[in-house]
Amino acid sequence: HIIGDIFDRGPRADRIMDELMAHAHVDIEWGNHDISWMGAAAGCPALIANVLRIALSYNSYDVLEDGYGLNLRPLSVFATEVYGDDPCERFLPHTLDDVVFDHVDAALTARMHKAIAVIQCKLEGQLLRAHPEYGMDGRRIFERCDFRRGTVMLDGVEYPLADTHFPTVDPDDPLA
């Protein structure tokens, strides 16, 4: 019996999954990160953005590029064009171990992380707006932001946003 979150236990979850699939009988209790990856593999745009964001936040290029063959170049080009002058300090990756080979610049990773985080917020907001039956209106955070003033309203209290540079967000329609 394997207790889940295989995709939240360190680097190269793809290799762990390959090893498990080689066994005839495996009993897995799936965790939330595992389910996110399944949803991404099934094509859910919000979950694709979610797993990309989490992987980038931990500098896990190996699982994305080597393990699953994802081409991150379009995201890196987009992030550089949109956030090239933004240090994206709040989006710097957490590094669990030193990358000796295939080092990726932390500033580029931060830009990519911020770009996919904004995309994820938009996609999740669109999904939740389209499905009020999910009962998750409390998760529609982007629509509670006042991007002109740089604030967010949570539980009736207005807070300043820690980051206010969002050139791809239309203040009148943040989910567009």
For each of these PLM feature ranges, what is it?
Residues 1-176:
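Feature recognizes metal-dependent phosphohydrolase scaffolds
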